[in-house]
């Protein structure tokens, strides 16, 4: 009987570190819920001590997630461990993930300690974390470049101290599959208490070998793989979990292991991560790319028509890609839209049918037939909209030609008031943005603008993703419409609402921080 490989997702921790603009608490919760639906065993959702915002998001997710174990990261520092435990204690099940550098380079140049001191710190921290939970993971940072004798020593010591999972990261993506698999084999051969812990791996993709190294580790006995959806992460990224999961599924004959993943949720979860993180998936990306199941060669097309297995080692249906069965138009009712959403894997609890249907009718009136990619885009935007937005775009008009400077008139509602402003700019989008900035008086700088067609043809929806800078922080905005000027305006308004909410949260967090400090002072006195 095959053994299970635990899937540990760190999209919301290691993956988010690569984003130009941090996710909001609501966006992080959406990602976490998608990962839960996909069936990940453990999700690492943040570094609680790093900021009040991270603490809040970890605590919020820990409170909401019921079917996956929620994990928080902590250095081998007492305060880190205590804060992580405080954020996680509301969870159904939680894990504290400790990490400490072990390579000679890191120990000497970064920590400036002896290896004996490093082992002592690790043991102390594992024991402290065990006071809060029996599920403690310890990571040997830069294990791929750690002398094997030292690695075996600290692994044995931390298992003895109570760590249930030992993670072996290839932190800088330095090793090759043969070499990395050998490291895992050495641990099984030379650590006497290795049977008392699960060996995990966490590989980075600097040399393009993260997935290969993870598979080699599984073959050598590792039973947990850490990574992110779509492989997002620092530098060249992390192990792409969807690739490891499907490699295990397709090559069970070779690997003789399995996962608890709901494979039909893979594509949808990949899209959620791509959309919310504003990181498009390359067309040639394995498993989830647009071309993953496309065949352009005549010979290949003929072979697929005769038997799909000629050129497909897995079917698109396995990861949740289904063929269109209904043509949706403005005459389609709520039941038809709901049915199609269910076929695509969406539950009604994940979106508002009334709001989605209203948006569907408006789009259907404009373009006639509405396709799956249109519905998914509408559902995504619908999910992004707060129940009560502070700013609302009421109206805009643009005059532009190749000979004259562009002029825009905009009406923006906030509260019970509607404000109007006109402005000129270097093109219609710039003019609209200048008018919006004049109304709100927010010192916003546009850093990134990206337009993506959500579908095919001239009537395709255009999604605009922007990154703006405000008071030293970056914020993401997204807009969707068949008119790219409208979607550009909506993206800016969306970013302004995100900024406004962040300001309100910041004010509340500062108030709570001042209140807690006041209490601490009273207790000290």
UniProtKB/Swiss-Prot annotation:
Keywords: Amino-acid biosynthesis, Branched-chain amino acid biosynthesis, Cytoplasm, Leucine biosynthesis, Manganese, Metal-binding, Transferase
Keyword Manganese attributed: yes
Cell compartments where the protein resides: Cytoplasm
InterPro entries: 2-IPM_HCS-like (IPR050073), 2-isopropylmalate_synth_dimer (IPR013709), AIPM/Hcit_synth_CS (IPR002034), Aldolase_TIM (IPR013785), LeuA/HCS_post-cat (IPR054691), LeuA_allosteric_dom_sf (IPR036230), LeuA_bact_synth (IPR005671), PYR_CT (IPR000891)
GO terms under biological process: L-leucine biosynthetic process
GO MF, one annotated term: 2-isopropylmalate synthase activity
Location of the region described as Regulatory domain in the Swiss-Prot/TrEMBL record: 392-525
Binding site for Mn(2+): 14, 202, 204, 238
UniProt cross-references to Pfam families, sorted A to Z: HCS_D2, HMGL-like, LeuA_dimer
Cofactors (names): Mn(2+)
Pathway(s) the chain acts in: Amino-acid biosynthesis; L-leucine biosynthesis; L-leucine from 3-methyl-2-oxobutanoate: step 1/4
The EC number(s) this enzyme carries: 2.3.3.13
CDD domains associated with the record: DRE_TIM_IPMS
Family: Belongs to the alpha-IPM synthase/homocitrate synthase family. LeuA type 1 subfamily.
UniProt-recorded name of the protein: 2-isopropylmalate synthase
Organism: Sodalis glossinidius (strain morsitans)
């Amino acid at each position: 009987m095959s053994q299970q490989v635990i899937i540990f997702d760190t999209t919301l921790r290691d993956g988010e570190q690569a984003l130009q603009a941090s996710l909001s608490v609501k966006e992080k919760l959406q990602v976490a819920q998608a990962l839960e639906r996909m069936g990940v065993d453990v999700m690492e959702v943040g570094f609680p001590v790093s900021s009040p915002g991270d603490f809040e998001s970890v605590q919020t997710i820990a409170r909401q997630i019921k079917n996956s174990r929620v994990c928080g990261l902590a250095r081998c520092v007492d305060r880190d461990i205590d804060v992580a435990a405080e954020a996680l204690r509301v969870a159904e099940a939680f894990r504290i993930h400790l990490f400490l550098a072990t390579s000679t380079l890191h120990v000497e140049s970064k920590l400036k300690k002896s290896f004996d001191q490093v082992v002592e710190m690790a043991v102390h921290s594992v024991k402290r974390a065990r006071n809060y939970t029996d599920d403690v993971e310890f990571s040997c940072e830069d294990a791929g470049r750690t002398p094997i004798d030292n690695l075996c020593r600290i692994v044995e010591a931390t298992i003895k101290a109570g760590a249930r999972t030992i993670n072996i990261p290839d932190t800088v993506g330095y090793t090759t599959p043969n070499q990395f698999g050998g490291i895992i084999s050495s641990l099984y051969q030379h650590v006497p208490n290795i049977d008392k812990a699960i060996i995990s791996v966490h590989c980075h993709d600097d040399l393009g070998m993260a997935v290969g190294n993870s598979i080699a580790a599984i073959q050598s006995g590792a039973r947990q793989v850490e990574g992110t959806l779509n492989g997002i992460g620092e530098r060249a990224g992390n192990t792409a979990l969807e690739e490891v999961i499907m490699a295990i599924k397709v090559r069970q004959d070779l690997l003789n292991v399995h996962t608890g993943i709901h494979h039909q949720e893979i594509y949808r979860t990949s899209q959620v991560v791509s959309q919310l993180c504003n990181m498009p998936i390359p067309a040639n990306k394995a498993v989830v790319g647009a071309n993953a199941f496309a065949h352009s060669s005549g010979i290949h097309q003929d072979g697929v028509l005769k038997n799909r297995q000629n050129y497909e080692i897995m079917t698109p249906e396995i990861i949740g890609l289904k063929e269109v069965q209904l043509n949706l138009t403005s005459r389609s009712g709520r039941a038809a839209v709901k049915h199609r959403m269910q076929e695509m894997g969406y539950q009604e609890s994940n979106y508002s049918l009334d709001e989605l249907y209203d948006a569907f009718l408006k789009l259907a009136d404009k373009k006639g037939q509405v396709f799956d990619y249109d519905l998914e885009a509408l559902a995504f935007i619908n999910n992004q909209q707060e129940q009560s937005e502070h700013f609302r775009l009421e109206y805009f008009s643009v005059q532009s030609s190749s000979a004259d400077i562009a002029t825009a008139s905009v009406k923006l509602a906030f509260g019970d008031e509607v404000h109007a402003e006109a402005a000129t700019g270097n093109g219609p989008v710039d003019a609209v943005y200048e008018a919006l900035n004049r109304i709100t008086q927010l010192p916003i700088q546009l850093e990134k603008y990206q337009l993506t067609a959500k579908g095919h043809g001239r009537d395709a929806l255009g999604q605009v993703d922007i990154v703006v800078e405000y008071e030293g922080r970056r914020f993401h905005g997204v807009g969707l419409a068949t008119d790219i000027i409208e979607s550009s305006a909506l993206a800016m308004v969306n970013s302004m609402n995100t900024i406004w909410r962040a300001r309100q949260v910041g004010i509340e967090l500062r108030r709570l921080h001042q209140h807690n400090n006041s209490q601490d002072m009273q207790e000290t006195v």
